[in-house]
């Protein structure tokens, strides 16, 4: 009886093994071995700055793509993309390097505090309760949700201005700070030649007089910048100007005519102590 039981169990196990083997072959998902090779040369930050869900997703996209144009690992940059191109036997793609930009210049001097917030130091929480400690309900709250979201120590709150500042040497344009900001004042913009760019450092949609009363550096929607721009790179919508970085040629005419200094020529972040 024992022998029969052993033989029966062995037969059942053998049949089960055959079925499992057949199923594994039938439902096997093939993965191109080059994906693992590409993933090995990537930094492994899994920041999502490339637009894909982690380094594995980006590696898969590189392998499947006919061309590497438009594909860029923001952490590794050109050197890493050159390695990827070598592995895949493709030409290294071209992609404009991006950087996070804080579109607020409401410093402590330009945007005086009118009240004091003693709640949890979180921009997300504070923004659900009220507009902030100043008369501008659009600007940087300065509680550092973007700082906490950044995995690269690339953004900090300047204690002198109360505004978030980006260290572009560390910024990988992963977009974590953009998602963390409840005021939507942080955006990814083209780094520009020699890390120079012009942007409107304000998102206040109030009418000119109200915006100027809340902050001395506010955009008042006067439209002088748009009229002066020879490249049609500037539009004024909802009382605030916006510069299309794909059209801007850094002629600086908008900077010269802006009455409040909202149009900024950005060169490099202020050094931190």
Model-found features: residue ranges?
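Feature marks short, highly hydrophobic, charge-poor N-terminal signal-anchor/signal peptide-like helices
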Residues: 1-8
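Transmembrane alpha-helical segments of multi-pass membrane transport proteins and ion-pumping complexes
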Residues: 13-21, 180
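Aromatic-capped interface at the extracytoplasmic side
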Residues: 21-32
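Iron-sulfur (Fe-S) cluster-binding segments and ferredoxin-like electron-carrier domains
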Residues: 38-41, 52-88, 264
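Iron-sulfur cluster-binding cysteine motifs and their immediate structural context
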Residues: 53-58, 115, 124, 135, ...
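Conserved small/polar residues in nucleotide/adenosyl-binding loops
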Residues: 266-273
């Amino acid at each position: 009886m024992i022998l029969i039981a052993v033989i029966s169990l062995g037969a059942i196990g053998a049949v089960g093994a055959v079925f499992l083997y057949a199923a594994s072959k039938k439902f096997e998902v093939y993965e191109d071995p080059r994906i693992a090779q590409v993933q090995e040369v990537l930094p492994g930050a899994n920041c999502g700055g490339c637009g894909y869900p982690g380094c594995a997703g980006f590696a898969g996209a590189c392998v499947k793509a006919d061309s590497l144009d438009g594909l860029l690992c923001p952490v590794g940059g050109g050197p890493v993309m050159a390695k990827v191109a070598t592995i895949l036997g493709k030409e290294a793609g071209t992609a404009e390097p991006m950087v996070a930009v804080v579109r607020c210049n409401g410093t402590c001097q330009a945007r005086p505090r009118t009240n004091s917030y003693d709640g949890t130091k979180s921009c997300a929480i504070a923004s659900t309760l009220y507009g902030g400690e100043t008369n501008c309900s659009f600007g940087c709250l300065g509680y550092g949700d973007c700082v906490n979201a950044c995995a690269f120590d690339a953004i900090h709150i300047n204690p002198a201005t109360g505004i978030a500042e980006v260290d572009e040497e560390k910024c990988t344009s992963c977009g974590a700070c953009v998602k963390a900001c409840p005021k939507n004042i942080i955006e990814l913009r083209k780094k520009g030649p020699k890390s120079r760019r012009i942007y409107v450092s304000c998102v206040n949609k109030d009418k000119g007089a109200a915006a100027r009363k809340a902050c001395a550096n506010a955009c008042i929607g006067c439209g002088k910048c748009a009229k002066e721009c020879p490249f049609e790179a500037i539009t004024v919508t909802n009382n605030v100007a916006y510069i299309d970085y794909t059209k801007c040629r850094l002629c600086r005419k908008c900077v010269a005519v802006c009455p409040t200094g909202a149009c900024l020529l950005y060169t490099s972040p202020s050094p931190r102590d």
